[in-house]
């Protein structure tokens, strides 16, 4: 489409990133006798798997990424396709979005708004406040790497899997008596995409590989084993494309031959092949595009070429699992998990499939790790995956819901590092937004409206109905303080404080006194994407603005105290905060969306912006503001449960904050349907936007742990559909790592590790009955108080772990995965011989090893570590396998394996044990043949 046509389509379909296109549901039919394949079992059911290739359907392909590089893997037998992205390939180039006519017309715009002349105000905004250009620029693809492998006939036993525990896509099938296997992963340590092809018959792999792209590109063969694609990003909105990129694909073979000419890579008669894909970009930052993109691509490829496949894989796993393995969750398993993933989605409404909620939760974490790493761009509307030159809403950053939602799970699900790109962006926007603040408002500080892009556009775009919203930068800046509440990192706060202060300063300069109400209000602004009267959204002081600014000004004031600066500014911020309009309850018993008690023309609108105060903020709480709490419930009832995918996901979080477990779980189930999840579990609105995935992960976390109200509230919205389960590794504000195990709908055991000294307040039903609290580090019983019947309070120390439990509950601060079903045969009977036990150590610990389940080609085991006569701070268990067993996954421990020798060290929450205390870790392993002898040299050492 042309730019103008595209913009008109946006407006016709409601312009904001949450606007829904016509739903196009898909179908999948259950397989009789279906069983999960070995790859899914090895992942403890944390895998997406299918018995059919993706064909040409992008929403059936499987995503991999390392934060910077992304690929969609199709898994076709005849032609493998890797659709490639690099996170800095944006249309156009650096531009100044500020409109110099804005400041001179601002007073008249405000007069019209206060006079209820909203249409006339919007007309003047269109003439004088729109950015230059009037739309922002799109995230674009690199292209495709295609491997032509031959005919797809004679294929059986086809399986395609995305293993969330290893971040690897595996395709395997039998063709003409040969077992072919492909593995694809994106390595963050080595900054390449790795495609590994193997066959169980020598000299069976033959293919031709080529690049293609919708961009302006040139293909070539720089050497005898490499092909190249050199290109430049597209033009858009009158801005010339200026991001150069180079993609390289290099083949290393065992057996056979490899050659390259004319942009085609030819492999013939190989037994195994490793294809390395490296991509370089000339994008340096939002102002500079003259980077050595060719040198970057070649340097990364050359470095990866010196590393064998085993080391590439092990480095990738060590990096990825250090993040992913922090959180374990088990919500139970039923036979529904034996169906392919697309079937599970299609039949979810009529099935009991609690494990799918765990899979959905962990998939969101996987996607965030794969699309957002330190030093990369933030995850955009599609994360990092896009195959279109003109993707929906440009696949950029929509700030009035979508970008913040992408990062709601970052801190709560223990992925703090993945949050860093957002703060890099905020610092960039404090520069571009300062230019807009001065030119369009005559103000200091900085401002960003409802969207930004790779060039950090900060002005009003897409028309005033959507774009004339002032508090985008304010919301992003408030995330600085929110992140600090989790981490306690004063240096982080000091580094980002200028951006936080600048966002607040803009509103100190621009808020105006409402002529009749006397409050300080934004003008002009809107309640995101929703008209209050026909075709007009512009107003003064919408409720969401007031809520965001209350958070922003409070955060800026508190941050200035922590870093010890700006006492005068601090006082101004607090005085301004106190003059903001309070939330009001309207005539329908709802939270008013605007200062006036208007009834919205679109009553089931996807945005519920005026409940920002309920979530993600803490301005509306059950115990602190009961009247507003009930009004928030009424607001949600009026808005209804339906909506776009991301809207449903936000509503999970809302209902979790209302502690309504049944309604929150209903919305989790509502999200799992074929018009809201694609076959590859990408969230649909439709079309695909990734924020729904992240919002769902956040919502499930909120159902299990909340920390926004000065306490850790365990299982605040636990549904009856999850009667028994465990979760560990969640994070709470105040610097806590939390685990909880439950049965019959209430906690049996709570484990909390403190990052810093302080007072810990715990709320759970557990405390309404008999319980014990133990300092696990030394076995002592800390003093506790009971300020409420379901609350205990105690003093905690940094680095120590505390356990609360019902009497008689064995110390097991771990999460046990669901027992996997066998792939083809019933499980064998666990060994009747006594478990293997390490030599006793009276003042140390002993380890007991046993097999708990087994199947053809694999087994599940567990090891219990029991402290001796003295408390321990940490433990390490080692053993030697006798039959070529390989550990694929460990929970509640950190493992490595060298040959037959396995080492498992404690996780961060279960190393400290009191005298006589015990903890258990589990694992999944593969085994060649039927012999699975107990290990030798089992030892346990302690610190």
Model-inferred region functions:
Residues 61-84, 88, 108, 128-129, ...:
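C-terminal capping/lid segments that line or modulate ligand- or cofactor-binding pockets
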Residues 762-778, 878-891:
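Solvent-exposed beta-hairpin/edge-strand motifs
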Residues 2, 8-28:
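N-terminal export signals
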Residues 810-841:
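Ser/Thr/Gly/Pro-rich low-complexity, disordered linker/stalk segments of secreted
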Residues 36-465, 482-484, 515, 562-565, ...:
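Aromatic-residue-lined binding/catalytic grooves and analogous aromatic/hydrophobic interfacial grooves
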Residues 205-213, 753-767, 871-882:
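Surface-exposed beta-strand/loop patches in extracellular or lumenal glycoproteins
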Residues 840-943:
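Extracellular low-complexity, O-glycosylation-prone Ser/Thr/Pro/Gly-rich "stalks"
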Residues 188-195, 199-200, 735-761, 861, ...:
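Carbohydrate-binding surface patches
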């Amino acid at each position: 489409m042309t730019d103008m046509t595209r913009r008109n389509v946006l407006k016709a379909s409601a312009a904001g990133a949450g606007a829904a296109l016509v739903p196009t549901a898909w179908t999948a039919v259950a397989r009789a006798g279906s069983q999960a394949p070995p790859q899914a079992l090895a992942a403890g059911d944390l895998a997406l798997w299918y018995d059919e290739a993706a064909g040409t359907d992008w929403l059936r392909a499987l995503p991999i990424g390392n934060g910077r590089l992304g690929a969609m893997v199709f898994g076709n037998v005849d032609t493998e396709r890797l659709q490639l992205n690099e996170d800095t390939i944006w249309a156009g180039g650096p531009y100044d979005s500020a409109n110099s006519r804005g400041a001179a017309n601002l007073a008249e715009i405000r007069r019209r708004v206060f006079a209820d002349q909203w249409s006339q105000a919007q007309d003047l905004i269109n003439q004088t406040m729109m950015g230059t250009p009037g739309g922002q620029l799109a995230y674009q693809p690199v292209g495709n790497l295609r491997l032509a492998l031959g005919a797809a006939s004679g294929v059986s036993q086809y399986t395609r899997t995305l293993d969330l525990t290893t971040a690897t896509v595996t395709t395997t099938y039998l063709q003409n008596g040969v077992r072919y296997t492909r593995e694809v992963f994106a390595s963050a340590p080595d900054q390449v995409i790795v495609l590994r092809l193997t066959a169980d018959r020598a000299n069976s792999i033959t293919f031709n590989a080529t690049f293609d792209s919708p961009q302006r590109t040139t293909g070539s063969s720089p050497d005898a084993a490499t092909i190249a694609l050199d290109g430049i990003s597209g033009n858009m909105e009158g801005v010339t494309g200026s991001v150069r990129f180079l993609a390289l694909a290099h083949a290393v073979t065992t057996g056979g031959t490899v050659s390259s000419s004319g942009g085609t890579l030819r492999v013939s008669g190989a037994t195994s092949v490793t294809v390395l894909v490296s991509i370089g970009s000339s994008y340096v930052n939002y102002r500079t595009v003259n980077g050595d993109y060719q040198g970057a691509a070649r340097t990364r490829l050359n470095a990866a070429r010196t590393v064998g496949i085993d080391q590439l894989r092990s480095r990738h796993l060590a990096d990825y699992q250090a993040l992913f393995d922090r959180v374990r969750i088990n919500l139970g398993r039923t036979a529904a998990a034996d169906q392919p993933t697309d079937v599970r989605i299609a039949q979810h409404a009529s099935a009991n499939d609690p494990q799918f909620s765990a899979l959905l939760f962990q998939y969101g974490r996987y996607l965030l790790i794969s699309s957002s790493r330190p030093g990369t761009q933030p995850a955009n509307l599609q994360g990092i995956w896009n195959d279109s030159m003109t993707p929906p809403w440009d696949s950029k950053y929509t700030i009035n819901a979508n970008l913040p939602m992408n990062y709601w799970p970052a801190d709560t699900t223990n992925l703090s590092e993945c949050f860093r790109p957002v703060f890099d962006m905020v610092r960039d926007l404090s520069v571009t937004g300062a230019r807009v603040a001065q030119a369009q408002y005559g103000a200091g500080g900085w401002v960003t409206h409802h969207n930004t892009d790779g060039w950090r556009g900060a002005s009003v775009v897409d028309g005033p109905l959507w774009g004339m919203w002032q508090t985008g930068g304010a919301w992003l800046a408030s995330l600085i303080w929110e992140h600090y509440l989790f981490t306690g990192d004063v240096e982080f706060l000091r580094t980002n404080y200028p951006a936080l202060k600048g966002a607040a300063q803009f509103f100190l300069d621009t808020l105006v006194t409402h002529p009749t109400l006397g409050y300080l209000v934004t003008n002009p602004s809107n309640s995101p994407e929703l008209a209050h009267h026909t075709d007009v959204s512009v107003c003064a002081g919408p409720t969401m603005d007031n809520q965001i600014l209350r958070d922003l000004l409070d955060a800026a004031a508190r941050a200035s105290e922590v870093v010890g600066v700006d006492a005068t500014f601090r006082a101004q911020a607090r005085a301004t905060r106190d003059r903001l309009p309070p939330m009001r309850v309207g005539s329908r018993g709802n939270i008013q969306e605007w200062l006036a008690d208007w009834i919205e023309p679109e009553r089931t609108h996807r945005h519920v912006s005026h409940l920002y105060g309920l979530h993600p903020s803490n301005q509306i709480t059950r115990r602190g503001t009961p009247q507003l709490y009930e009004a928030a419930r009424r607001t949600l009832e009026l808005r209804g449960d339906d909506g776009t995918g991301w809207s449903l996901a936000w509503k999970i979080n809302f209902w979790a904050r209302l502690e309504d477990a049944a309604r929150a779980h209903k919305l989790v189930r509502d999200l799992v349907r074929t018009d809201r999840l694609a076959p590859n579990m990408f969230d649909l609105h439709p079309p695909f936007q990734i924020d729904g995935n992240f919002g769902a992960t956040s919502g499930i976390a909120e159902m299990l742990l909340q920390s926004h109200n000065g306490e850790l509230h365990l299982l605040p919205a636990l549904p009856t559909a999850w009667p028994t389960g465990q979760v560990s590794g969640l994070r709470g504000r105040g610097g806590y790592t939390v685990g909880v195990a439950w049965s019959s709908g209430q906690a049996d055991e709570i484990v909390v590790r403190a990052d810093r000294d302080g007072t810990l307040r715990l709320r759970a039903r557990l405390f309404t009955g008999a319980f014990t609290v133990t300092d696990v580090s030394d076995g002592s019983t800390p003093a506790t108080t009971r300020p409420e019947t379901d609350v205990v309070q105690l003093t905690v120390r940094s680095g120590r772990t505390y356990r609360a439990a019902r009497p008689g509950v064995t110390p097991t601060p771990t999460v046990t995965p669901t027992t996997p079903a066998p792939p083809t045969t019933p499980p064998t009977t666990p060994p009747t011989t006594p478990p293997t036990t390490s030599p006793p150590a009276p003042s140390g610990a002993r380890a007991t090893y046993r097999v708990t389940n087994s199947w053809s080609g694999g087994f599940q085991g567990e090891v219990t570590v029991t402290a001796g006569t003295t408390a321990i701070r940490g433990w390490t268990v080692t053993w030697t396998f006798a039959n070529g067993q390989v550990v694929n996954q460990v929970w509640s421990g950190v493992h490595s394996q060298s040959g037959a020798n396995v080492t498992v060290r404690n996780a961060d929450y279960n190393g400290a044990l009191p005298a006589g205390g015990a903890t258990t870790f589990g694992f999944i392993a593969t085994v060649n043949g039927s012999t699975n002898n107990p290990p030798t040299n089992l030892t346990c050492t302690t610190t």
